[in-house]
Design a protein with these regions (language model features):
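Catalytic or ion-translocation cores adjacent to nucleophile or general acid/base/metal-coordination motifs
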Residues: 12
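Canonical Radical SAM [4Fe-4S] cluster-binding loop centered on the CxxxCxxC motif
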Residues: 24-66
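A residue-level signal for beta-strand positions that form part of recognition/binding surfaces
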Residues: 6, 29, 81
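Short, small-residue-biased leader/transition segments that mark boundaries at the very start
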Residues: 2-9
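Core AdoMet radical
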Residues: 53-68, 74-98, 102-169, 175-180
């Protein structure tokens, strides 16, 4: 139901025009991506997350050989788009690590997207040069009071830094910005 009382005929015409415009712009394609976890190191203390800094788990950050081995398996599966993920640990998987990893794999993929800790505009610009196409940022809640409860320590505790990430991505010129909650 809509606010404007469209007729069934008018709605079908709009739907047809919309479909045509979408196909003209994007073609008849569906794009799949595959995730690759580069690191589970994390400096945050999010109460809901298995990567929580306090959790006593085996921590791993992939080295060059491990990254390439994973990428070769992924390519055999036919994927052209990859999502690189890490815990939020600038010490273990900061901009230098991500830049290097992207340079290692960029010739394997049409698109590289990240789901990592929020960064500065300059850091995102560096990563664009290394092949960054998109970034996904998840905001677990928009309620500032609840956010503080869920994120008691670590960089992620800074609500404003996190919520302003899409703005920094846009300023940096990142092509695709994905938001989730």
């Amino acid at each position: 139901s809509t606010l404007f009382p469209y007729t069934t005929l008018f709605r079908s015409i709009m739907a047809k025009k919309s479909r045509e415009a979408t196909q003209k712009r994007f073609g008849k394609t569906i794009q799949f991506y595959i995730p690759l976890y580069l690191s589970n190191e994390c400096s945050n203390h999010c109460i809901y997350c298995g990567f929580n800094h306090k959790n006593k788990i085996s921590r791993v950050t992939l080295d060059d050989d491990e990254i390439i081995a994973e990428v070769k398996v992924i390519k055999k599966m036919g994927y052209e788009h990859i999502l690189l993920l890490t815990g939020e640990s600038p010490k273990h998987s900061g901009v230098e690590y991500l830049e290097h990893a992207m340079q290692l794999i960029r010739h394997y993929f049409k698109q590289i997207t990240l789901e990592v800790q929020p960064m500065s505009v300059d850091d995102y610009k560096r990563l664009i040069v290394s092949g960054l196409h998109g970034v996904y940022v998840y905001q677990e809640t928009y309620c500032k009071e609840r956010y503080t409860l869920y994120h008691p320590a670590g960089k992620k505790k800074d609500y404003n830094w996190r919520i302003d990430t899409p703005d920094r991505l846009g300023i940096a010129g990142v092509h695709k910005i994905g938001l989730g909650a």
